[in-house]
Amino acid sequence: MKILRSEESKAAARKLLTDFLKKRRAALKPADVGLPSGSRLRRTPGLRRPEVAQLAGISTEWYTLFEMGRDRAMSQRVIEPISRALRLTEAEREYVSDLVRAELRPQPTLEIAPALCRLLEDDEKVVVVVDRWLTAVRWNAAAAALLSLDAADERSTNLLWRFQQAYALKPCPELESQGRFFIGIFRRALGRDPLNREANRIVASLRSYPTFRELWERHEVHSLDEESRVLRHPFRPFNSALDEIRYFTIGLPIPASAGGHVRITVPADDAGRSLLRQVTSAQTLLSA
């Protein structure tokens, strides 16, 4: 059964659409898309609306109405040419599609399948299951040892909150990159459910922090398959001796969970695996 957006939900989605498209226009120069820069000084950075319309093969009026979120311009047919014009990624194109659609997508609950339960029993890896708002809902002993999740309050189980706290203690470019990725994942989920109370509560609680606010206002959108790199673990670990270990981290989507995924982190070398094993054993003994 189709569930149409309420007027409030529609207005929230269109506001996100307008902001996102403006940010993407501002991020592109004419030379980036094969257009002449011209001799006139530009009052605003990036592409102008007529230039996007030209690249998309639609009228300037139609693109303007689309960017402004006007009902009569809300068509899935123009998303593809506009996405090409703005050089959108697949995740960004899907985000725009979610904001434009008239129906709300059903949001299934996050269920822990038996195979995932077995994975959570593996203490050679750090395994954390997060919901679509990046709040940890299940984790294994290795994750408890590394991230102190067993002792964390409800707020501190959220990855955006943990990023902000870690960055305030020790800012670095690598950590900022991870924060941008998490925020982009969160943005992607918010496009499906822009009025969600839990999501908006999380954002409101973090807006007072300048770093989060600056990254949030960039309006970047990311997908899990973009996280394919080795990073120093971005969060303050259980033991400071683990801070210098390098990790491989991958996020895998959980089917039919509307954005929930499992994060699997493993040390990149034997020394790291040995140290993680030691602190996990110590954590298990303390919890017994």
What are these model-predicted stretches?
Residues 114-131, 138-286:
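Hydrophobic protein-protein interaction segments
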Residues 45, 55-56, 86, 140:
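Core residues of bacterial helix-turn-helix
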Residues 38-44, 49-50, 56-73:
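Recognition helix of helix-turn-helix/homeodomain-like DNA-binding domains
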Residues 3-21, 74-119:
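Short amphipathic recognition helices of helix-turn-helix/homeodomain-type DNA-binding modules
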Residues 68, 97-101, 135:
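Short amphipathic alpha-helical surface patches that mediate protein-protein
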Residues 1-48:
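A short, Lys/Arg-rich alpha-helix, primarily the initiator
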Residues 22, 26, 54, 84, ...:
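Short polybasic/polar patches that bind polyanions
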